[in-house]
Amino acid sequence: MTLNKSEVSWKSPSNIALIKYWGKKENQIALNPSISFTLKNCYTSTSISFIKSNNFQYEFKFHGNHKPEFIPKLDVFFSRIKKCLPSLSKLSLNINSFNSFPHSRGIASSASAFSSLALCLIEIESMFSNIINEDNFFEKASFISRLGSGSASRSIYGPLTCWGKTELYPGSSDQYAIPINIKNNNFPTFCDSILIVDSGIKKVSSTLGHQLMDNHIFKNERISQSHLNSSKLKKSIESNDINSFQEVVENEALTLHALMMTSNPNFILFKPNTINIIEHVLKFRDETNTKICFTLDAGANVHLLYPKSSFQIVQDFIKKSLIVFCDEGRFINDEVGLGPEKN
């Protein structure tokens, strides 16, 4: 075929899980379903220029620089997807990627990175093959994203997304994420203020953490809990019960870190200032009745979730009481968004 262009570009956001997944089966399948808010301002933009080649090859740059430390993970990713995207076998790719937020500063970037890369690759495949069409484009992108990073599958849609088979959401799948239709027009748009407690690289990778769930003493209990919490979360959103929503989100965050601390070997990823922030948030909520809750990724940073209508009061609270616990006073304000955009 004759191509009218040889470059594609997408930007895709990160996401914050409300229902966490922790542990994997074979082939990048999660141990339990997960549900997340898609973010808006924390995104990765990826561009790929390509030419025909005798065999597959790629060059990768991040913010204009070669990053050898990224190559092993990319090699694994491309080895996983080559059967799904046959056109890649005869292409040479020049990949350029950048984040809107600081890399290695405690913000999980694999979700935005692999989802933006997957969207570009799916668009390229659609130029050479009829297996990609308008109806399955984003589903295929979510599938491919999962093979790079499980959480990346959820970044393909917004504002609320589910990855993993569950009776709660018809059409849900272990292979890709689906958008959740919020059946409540009164459910507020949420903000996510990310408090940077630790900017360093995690001592224990999420990959190792997932592996430690294989023989975890609480493995089966966690699977049951995640399904129960998913049901509670769905009901809280549909009934506009923010108190119940907050309870589930915080329970999931604390459970995630409890699983880390009770694995063998065990490990702790939060820091003293993580606890300081949580204690101040709970006290602030009790004293002011502000609708605000915390959640945590597999790290030390704290995500504050609250309705957009409370933005100013929460900003004042952060600057007055929480910024002292942030690494060099850093925090990032984001909000729930609608998903990826074509550049």
Question: Over which residues does each language-model region extend?
Answer:
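Short alpha-helix boundary/capping segments
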Residues: H66-E69, A108-S112, F218-E221
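Short amphipathic alpha-helical segments
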Residues: H66-K73, A113, F137, N273, ...
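Short beta-strand scaffold segments in enzyme catalytic cores
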Residues: A17-K20, T44-S49, A152-S155, P159-C162, ...
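Short, solvent-exposed loop/turn segments at the edges of secondary structure
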Residues: L39-N41, I156-G158, P188-F190, G299
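ATP-binding N-lobe of GHMP and related small-molecule kinases
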Residues: M1-R105, L119-N130, E134-D135, F331-N343
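Charged/polar, low-hydrophobicity segments characteristic of intrinsically disordered regions
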Residues: V76-R80, S151-C162, L228-K232, S236
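C-terminal nucleotide
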Residues: T2-N27, I51-K52, Q57, I182-N343
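Gly/Ser-rich oxyanion-binding loop with an adjacent helix/lid
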Residues: K83-F187
